[in-house]
Regions:
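Conserved C-terminal structural/oligomerization subdomain of aldehyde/semialdehyde dehydrogenase
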Residues: 13-16, 48, 59-61, 68-193
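Active-site region of PLP-dependent enzymes
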Residues: 16-22
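Conserved small-domain helix->loop->beta segment predominantly found in fold-type I
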Residues: 22-23, 52-63, 76
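Short beta-strand to alpha-helix junction loop
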Residues: 29-40
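Helical element adjacent to the flavin cofactor pocket in flavoenzyme catalytic cores
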Residues: 41-51
């Protein structure tokens, strides 16, 4: 394994999973039992199809109640696996190598349902801006994770249907109407009423 993969594994294993405002929690529960079962199924199916589980993949030790999934790291993930093709909406990282930036962008845009958020981490901001412009996601975050009620939030395709947060979210509820008025009211467009 390369140094990047080792760092991701270390970060996943060091995550503090739970739900307690008095402790420094880094990973909370997934939304409900159905989501947990779906995520567990994605991991189990990937492993049965040849992916390698390097961290997580099940409930964290000591958290038998609730909908917690330990931060999960998979390698040897192929493009035919559901964990590759679908947005997980859970603490699962699939490490998939690439050879060219064209291949990287093709793979990143290869989600069946559309795209809610993509994250880019790099020291090369010109590269980040290039990739951001080429990604088909409703939200691109560069070198960080930022969620703010004043920033628009929403996806593309079937992901994050509609938009919320910020004044732009109101556009989903508005209907445009055009009214044109002639400035010359003496002839009324030749109708002479």
């Amino acid at each position: 394994r390369d140094a990047f993969t080792e760092k991701v594994i270390d970060r996943a294993r060091a995550a503090k999973v739970g739900f307690d405002k008095t402790v420094d929690i880094t990973t909370g529960p997934v939304i409900d039992a159905r989501a947990w079962t779906r995520l567990k199924g994605l991991v189990d199916d990937a492993v049965s199809e040849g992916a390698t589980l390097l961290a997580g993949g099940d409930r964290p030790a000591g958290l038998n109640a609730g909908h917690y999934l330990a931060p999960t790291v998979l390698t040897d993930v192929t493009e035919t696996m559901a964990v590759y093709r679908e947005e997980t909406f859970g603490p699962i990282v699939s490490i998939v190598p690439f050879d060219t930036k064209t291949e990287l962008l093709r793979m990143a845009n290869d989600c069946e349902e559309g795209g809610l958020t993509a994250y880019i981490f790099t020291r090369n901001l010109a590269r980040a801006e290039h990739y951001a412009a080429s990604l088909r996601y409703g939200e691109i975050q560069i070198n960080g994770v930022k969620y703010d009620i004043n920033l628009p939030h929403g996806g593309i395709g079937q992901s994050g249907i509609g938009h919320d947060c910020s004044a732009l979210a109101l556009h989903d509820y508005l209907v445009q109407k055009r009214i044109t008025r002639a400035l010359d009211t003496t002839t009324f467009g030749g109708l002479n009423p």
